[in-house]
Design a protein with these regions (language model features):
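N-terminal nucleophile
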Residues: 1-260
Length: 260
């Protein structure tokens, strides 16, 4: 993922609402969201090159999502894919507080990342860019891109404010959330972060919905957990031109699985 906004225990009827975009190289093979053949409890898209995923949930209510931390100067080659961290959490049974030690994962073996985890009771956030950045989250509206949680990049602020409007409604509207994820406006130069990439790329990456030669937003996903135990998972995929290709919707029944 490259942009995630989420409301955690803010809406009285929907304890977790997630709206996110996945940005990736356009030639990287990807499978759309579905239940996995090898792990049928996992519902997620899949990176067919490395085998992991950027975001997903399970039929038991676990959720995880990941963004890369953008710092070209520290990127190492030949290290494990960060997408396997999401898969590991979804397959694990430990709490957000105990992961990843419970799975015997060395977080320093990966390039920089941010990881969000929800175990059904608590929402966790961690980043391997600084070992002190690891905590359970309080209720609130959050935004995450390719820096730390709630870093006030323009598109992060925009996504949070757009999500806040949905949270104030009686029922969040999936189409409206997919709509604000489609915002392709570029931030003005004075508001751009400096992440070590050329200015032309920094500009392109400042949009919520990215279109750049060879790279761009591949999918938008909205996940809504209801207090009634029902979760809706909606994914919209895009072609290389940015046009919508398909929208897939799943409803997961968590009754008797977790207590939200």
């Amino acid at each position: 993922m490259c942009l995630i906004s989420f409301a955690y225990r803010v809406h009285p009827d929907f304890p977790l609402i997630v709206a996110a975009n996945r940005d990736e190289f356009l030639n990287r093979e990807t499978a759309p969201a579905d239940y996995w053949d090898d792990y049928p409890e996992i519902l997620a898209g899949r990176d067919l090159q490395a085998g992991g995923t950027w975001m997903g949930m399970t039929t038991a209510g676990r959720f995880a999502a990941l963004t890369n931390y953008r710092d070209p100067s520290s990127e190492l080659k030949g290290v494990p894919s960060r997408g396997e961290l999401v898969t590991q959490f979804l397959r694990d049974t430990s709490t957000s507080e105990l992961f990843p030690e419970s799975a015997e994962i060395d977080i320093d073996a990966y390039n920089g990342f941010n990881l969000l985890t929800f175990d059904g009771a608590h929402m966790g956030y961690m980043s391997n860019t600084n070992r002190s950045i690891r905590r359970l989250l309080a209720p609130g509206i959050y935004g995450l891109s390719n820096h730390l949680l709630d870093t006030p990049w323009p598109k992060v602020q925009l996504a949070k404010s757009s999500l806040e409007k949905q949270v104030s409604a009686a029922t969040p509207d999936t189409e409206n959330m997919l709509g604000f994820l489609r915002d392709d406006r570029i931030a003005v130069d004075e508001l751009l972060p400096s992440t070590g990439v050329p200015l032309e790329i920094e500009r392109a990456l400042s949009a919520s919905f990215i279109r750049f030669p060879g790279y761009g937003t591949r999918s938008s996903t909205v996940i809504i957990y209801g207090m009634d135990g029902s979760v809706t998972f909606t994914e919209r995929t895009f072609d290389v031109s940015g046009a919508s290709v398909a929208t897939r919707k799943f409803v997961v029944d968590l009754k008797d699985q977790i207590s939200l």
